[in-house]
């Protein structure tokens, strides 16, 4: 499959539904995020709970020495072309499963030891690595070749090293890594690597085909845009009552309660069911008072901030884009949620009865740290009043 023209430091390797991704970290990112305790390189990341944990540093190795490589990212595979020969191929065959194939080199996956809670052999060809820092277990098993786990000290840090390497005179090896909540159940056999890769490719192509046609000169850009959207989805889990589109699998690993509207608008014409899920994923957590959370991920619901009531405007636009959103059942559901959301602003953010609701923080407006809030709080923003008037007009 054709590689995408992207820098993995800016666009992560992932797939639709996955809670795993691989991201490049450069010197500046490591320096600006000392709390991550990471160093430059390619990191396998856990994207539960906002994607806050870089778990394994991935390095092609030969004779114990890390080798420079060139990453080539396509929707179905991340291929690391090793300087001097050899490849490491990585495929996310499922939401929590990474297939690994090495040829002419080995792969070292290094976890910072302070994140770990022990590593244990659980079979002739499988290891379990407990990572309290990510609140997850990692099971690594060999399909061909060998998997070994050891501890090592490099660059003044202690690591738990997992090595995937050819054995018995072979030049290639395959392994599988599973991220799980609790110990993973392993199948007796695994599908061939190329079969797993083909299934991912088919899933992406089906998603891409639903997108609007573009002129030939924009085809590569449209394919990249489709990949970014496709790979930003996470599967239902915990608070994620539906398949949801994150803002990014780089740094913004949540769904905020106005960004979800833009995701719904973007999908409305080409995939109305997915667009409906994006619109509703926030309203699934609406309180009895009518308030909705500021942001959600699979483990967190944040209610101490808000976002402005653009939801009526967004749903009206979605109806204009696709008649599917005017279906009676969807219209009734949207009306119920939007009515309660509108009334909440008047009941809880209009203490002086002026019918001019208030922002209590910059985050409530989406302007976050805008200088307009230097005057202090509360702020009766004309944009807020305008959004609410428009939402109530649409409801009427």
Per-region residue spans from a language model:
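Short, charged low-complexity intrinsically disordered segments located at boundaries
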Residues: 1, 86, 94, 253-261, ...
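Extended, well-ordered alpha-helical scaffold segments
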Residues: 189-192, 196-199, 203, 217-224, ...
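The feature captures the catalytic groove of carbohydrate-active enzymes
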Residues: 160-189, 289, 294-310, 324-326, ...
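Substrate-binding groove/exosite segments of carbohydrate-active enzymes
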Residues: 208-320, 331, 339
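A residue-identity detector for tryptophan
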Residues: 43, 127, 159, 190, ...
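Active-site-proximal flexible loops/turns
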Residues: 121-123, 266, 314, 390
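Acidic surface patches and DE-rich sequence motifs
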Residues: 14, 235, 350
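Terminal accessory carbohydrate-recognition/targeting modules of carbohydrate-active enzymes
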Residues: 1-217, 250
